[in-house]
Amino acid sequence: MKGLKRSRGNAMALAGAMVIAFSIAGCAPDTPVTATGEDPGQGTGGGPVTPDVSDQEVLDARRAAGIDECPTTDASGPVVEEGPAVEGGLPDLTLDCLGGDSTVRLASLRGPLIINVWAQWCGPCRAEAPYLAEFADTHPEVQMLGIDYADPRPGAAVAFADEADWDWPQLSDPDRSIAGPLKVVGPPHTVFVDADGRIVHVHAGPFTSTEQLEDLAAEHL
């Protein structure tokens, strides 16, 4: 993997300081924390989302960054099963893969799976990013899936995922369609899904260490 792996110690120390600095539980979309210093623009407050680049440019950037293709019945990554939604499972919603080259039906996903809802404009998301990357590095038995949420800049989102060393599949939800079904107040918001497709735990707000994420995965998955 790329990026943070080459300077993981410094990144982890910086992440710890950032988590302390961001003492809020997460980023409410109406009042986003902008770690880049840029105005996140429309979309984070419920208005229409105007992407910063075309789908093709996002797709090209995603593939250049080595981010995995989104899951299908024939692909590696989270297990997909055709059939009805599972009671207590993910909502029966279909989201685009970041880049628009495919779609994923959430209700078809099976675990063990961790779904992390994030946005490139969200400061706490950036703070927890190294912990997610380290967990994914050391726990290949747990599948990872991201959802870029309420984000008007998918191009910047791909750049963030690349810098964060996130190579797992990423979906896109610019219109916040998962907000109600998954009770997302704002990112980061993380959902744990078991092998039967049931939601077994939800963590609202940023992780403060890799160990915290490991403990939750061991307890619930």
Please provide the spans of the model-predicted regions.
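Bacterial N-terminal signal peptides that target proteins for export
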Residues: 3-15
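C-terminal motif of bacterial Sec signal peptides marking the signal peptidase cleavage site
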Residues: 22-26
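Thiol/disulfide oxidoreductase modules built on the thioredoxin-like
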Residues: 159-166, 173-221
